[in-house]
Structure formats: C-alpha cells, structure tokens
C-alpha cells in the first residue's frame, strides 16, 4: 500500500486490515540506512570532511542499534549530524490520536492509550506523525531537573481527577517520555548534573522510569544522541561512568583536515546575498587565506587548543571579507569590485569572538592576536604561490624579490588606502619597481585583476617574511623598507 493510501486510514481497525506493521525507532533507522547504502543515496548531506571518518562510524552505530555520543570540539557539526538523522526515519508513523507520548496503536504504553483501545477497540482514532516532528533537542544546563526530563506527580491533576498520587494518571510526563518514538538529543551532556544523569540509567538500559518513588514499567522507544565537548570533562563536569557505559557508541568528530574541505564548508554555510555576489568578486587566493586563519588559530600558542576553533570563524570571517569589499565599493560609488588582501583586516571582529585565548594571548590582547593570525596565514599561504623568501638568504641564487626590496630601500614607500579607488590602487602597485616583472615571471597568463591582487599579496608576503616593513594604520596600510620606523611597527609583526 502506498503512503498516500495509508494516510487516508483513520482508525486502528483499518490499519490492521491494511496489514500495517510498526517497528521500533532503531529498526526504522537501521532498515532505512540499509536501503540508502544499497542505493548509493547520500544520507548526511552537507556534512563535509567526514566521509571516511565520522560518517562510517555513525552508520555502524545505527546498524548496531546503538545510542550515540558525539564527542568533539565546538563547530564540528555534531548537532547538524543529529538533526539529519531524521531523514532515516519512516516518513509517517501512526499514533493514537490525543496521546501525549505518541502511543503506538499496536503497543500502547500510557494509561490513556491502553484505556482508549480497551474502550474503543478497532474504532480507536489514529493520526499520522511526520518524521520532521520526531526530533527533540534539549540543551543540558545545570538547572535541568529530573522533573523536566522524566516527569513529576501533578497534585492539581490528581485533585481534579480525584485520584491518589499512586495512580499513574497523576503523573505529568517530562520531556523524555513525551519524546517517545523520537530521536532525543541532549547537547553538552557533561553540563548535566550527576544526579540528573543517574536518572537516565534505566531509561537507556531497562526502559524503567521512576518518579518520586512511583515505579512503573514503560519501555520507551527512543534513539538517544548525546553531544559533548572534551573540554567540558575538566572545566564544567563529566559524564558519569555508568551512563557512559550505557551509551554504546562514542564517536569522535574533528575539524576539516585540509583547506579545500574547509573552503567548501565556508562557501556552503556563509550567508551572502545575491546583491553581494553580484557586487563583490572574491578570488580563490583570498578564500584560501580566510581558511588558513582558522588553521593557524588551531596551532597558535596564543589560542586555547582545548577550547577549539570553530568552523564558524572561517564562515564569519568570509562574510566580513565580502562586506568589507562591499562597503568600500558603496562608499566609492563603484558598481562592482574585487576583494583585496587589505580587506582581510576587516575580518578582525569576526576572529575576536571565535577564539579563546590562553594567558599569553590575553596579555597581547585579542586584536593583536587576530592581526598576528592573519599575518601567519599570509606567511603560510605565500609559499603556495611564490618561492620561499627564506631560501634566498641561505643560497647564492638570484633573488626574484631583490628589485622590489631595493625599490623600498631607496627611500620609497607605498601607502594603500583601505578605501582606495581601483584605478588609484592599480596605479600605486604598478609604481613598485620589479613587482610587475615578478608577476609576469610566475603568472604571465593571469587576468589583469588577478595580477593586481597578486602584486598586493607579494607585498604582504614579503612583510610576513620580514623582507619589508608593514604598518597598519587606521585608514591605510603602509609598506616601507625593513629598517625604517621599526619602533612603530604594528602589533602582529612583534608577535613571535
């Protein structure tokens, strides 16, 4: 019978006659995953960088009918993975109409469900629950109580129904029983107090729930997914050992392992409007630089590695990069523009809020650390485009940067305004002796726009390798010879 025909069924009797059979949620997930694997269908769409690591682990856990704990630093798509698991549920399932815990018509758990079927039999009304409504998420915080998750005796309900507190009908169910036949996610599990974690023991293993000494057998049909940050184990709490023992699969997530994957994630997640896309062109070089900032932050001695550096840093920084170029174009009355290396300094505010600094970083200050990370990103990416300047210090071979450096040593400087018109920007770069020749040497076939971006990049790259002096001013970036104004050099150049 097709799903369209099934949805027309409104009573238990009709459901029986249709030959419908229910199954528990873990079998649903398993069966639908098996079908997806056989057909080659992608299950976790948009989850990048996990195809050979995390996703196979999740698939194994689902096939094993396991509860899952996703362990990883912030910004590693743990919650997104959990939410996408609803795609493996059946599109619709039947529930007893009016049941607060989504009773299965063939195996009701609640007093309401059992009584309804006892009274109405095959005339029991059913309704169809869509898989999109079968996902429940709870953020673990220290103020969460057992009553919130499991339930409590409701004295008002007992009084209205004129029943004793020992009657099951006096119970007000908490979030977990109300999530029966659903995927239930508890985020940041270590933040849950130990005594609250203990309340989950029997639900996970035996299906019992206890409410203020009222013990009842209620084999809830749940797929639990927990998320946790390793930092939480020491800073805020821990997962108690018996609970950890009952979570059958613990899967460790990770950050993107290379720039290309990280870049794809950023392009997928960044919120850039159509107007911005039409106005601002962002060269691939700048996209690589944005991603490199996150990679530098994860290795930096100024950043707390235990806290992690979320993928949201790259996403926010990329959005700021586009907005910086867009703002310049709007101010100058330009209909379109190409993002520049200097626009990356507009990403500092995005970087500041995404990194946790250690003591040394706090001493330097968040802005200086952000500037330092940008400089390090430029330094790391520079050798992917041009020869390593360091090698010419050690070897007696012709230095391709020599004419550029000599031009600055001859008492020339270059002051690039952050809001420079394109023609003025190009004119200034063209004035640097040896710069055009260097670009033609390595990128002769590049477009005019690309060549000017590369020219600017060369100056930043040489500064990051201490071949030139770069001064970041309020409204411009000034390039001078290495030995001038050393005492006024900006923050990041002084960080080592």
Residue spans of the language-model regions?
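Conserved ASCE/P-loop NTPase catalytic core
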Residues: 2-260, 271-288, 301-305, 382-496
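Elongated, mostly alpha-helical coiled-coil "stalk/stator" tethers of large membrane protein machines
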Residues: 360-375, 379, 383-386, 399-402
